[in-house]
Amino acid sequence: MTTFQTAPVTLPTPLGGSLVRRIWRPGQDFDPAELAGRPRLELSSRSLADLEMIATGAYSPLTGFVGEADYLSIIEHLRLADGTPWSLPITLPVTAEQAAGLSGRVVLTHGGEPVGTLDIEEKYAAQKSLEAREVYRTEEEAHPGVAALYAQGDVYLAGPVTLFEVPRGEFPRAHRTPAEVREVIEARGWRSTVAFQTRNPIHRAHEYLQKVALELVDGLLLHPLVGQTKGDDVPAETRMEAYEVLLRGYYPQERTLLSVYPAAMRYAGPREAIVHALSRRNYGATHFIVGRDHAGVGSYYGTYDAQEIFNTYTAEELGIRILKFEHTFYCQSCGQLVSPRTCPHDSSHHLVLSGTKVREKLRAGENLPPEFTRPEVAEVLRKAYTR
């Protein structure tokens, strides 16, 4: 009888060659208890999220907040100074007054509690107008990313960081580091994994994209962003409940992993799509879905700009395959979910609900049509909006 040996799972190499780990462990060159006399710096929610993403290796190869050479190279060339693909400047802003009083090893705090350290190697001036134009493609403060940029300090601190403990937050069972996600993928024997980024509840069009992709690969990493978002986005706790009921009823459990992505949204559209893809490579994904207006807001970016920007790099540089999908919707004449590639009917036949329209219906206590979202998801959302 012929026997077949199962080949071991080979996960993609993290960006930069190895997974960064900047989480404090006993035996390191310092003990957190010995830092009582060091200067302190309170982090915003976004900077705390950046600290975690750096320290756990999600933002490999970054080992800290970027210095000026990397900052300018990212802005102007979508690469680190050494040529590695990277599209968002991960910086630590402070005021000029704060910067003047900080040097050496600084204790980073959040809510007054120590969460990590920064070894300051560099202080430099933020070039906000340039950053806004190149990263967000606008200087309008109506853009939430630009508004945040202009509101923060004018000096950036750079240097390696250490995180004392991974903040598991509201969803400890689903809060996994890149190393932990990689362990799950290996344990399940997935040789190919597609990651799906979302900051919204999953509607039928998203489900369609995920399941089309799941026909091509072994596993789906459903990776909702739970960091800071803008005020009118659906809260993370509501979204997580919606994801869980959807997965229980409509997805193969052994081929699906729900794990949170703790980054904050910057709404940088195409540039943010690149970091979303590269970081999912660090989590162990081999494929990444990019749909219409990925990480966009308002009308600042073209519908498929976030797909086209990946042409900036070679496939070898990216190290993760980008699955580009067109806009999908329910066609009443076709009687199913379709895209412009598969549907011959005009828009009068299509059921499309904007996020604004969905929120209006939910606040009014109205049901969402089953062609748009699963009834179980609609019920979770309806309850959340009518409490």
Curated annotation (Swiss-Prot):
Q: Does the keyword ATP-binding apply?
A: yes
Which SUPFAM superfamilies does its entry note? Nucleotidylyl transferase (SSF52374), PUA domain-like (SSF88697)
One MF annotation (Gene Ontology) recorded for this entry: sulfate adenylyltransferase (ATP) activity
What biological processes does GO assign it?
Answer: hydrogen sulfide biosynthetic process; sulfate assimilation
Q: In which pathway does it act?
A: Sulfur metabolism; hydrogen sulfide biosynthesis; sulfite from sulfate: step 1/3
* The enzyme's E.C. designation: 2.7.7.4
Q: What is this protein called?
A: Sulfate adenylyltransferase
Organism of this sequence: Deinococcus radiodurans (strain ATCC 13939 / DSM 20539 / JCM 16871 / CCUG 27074 / LMG 4051 / NBRC 15346 / NCIMB 9279 / VKM B-1422 / R1)
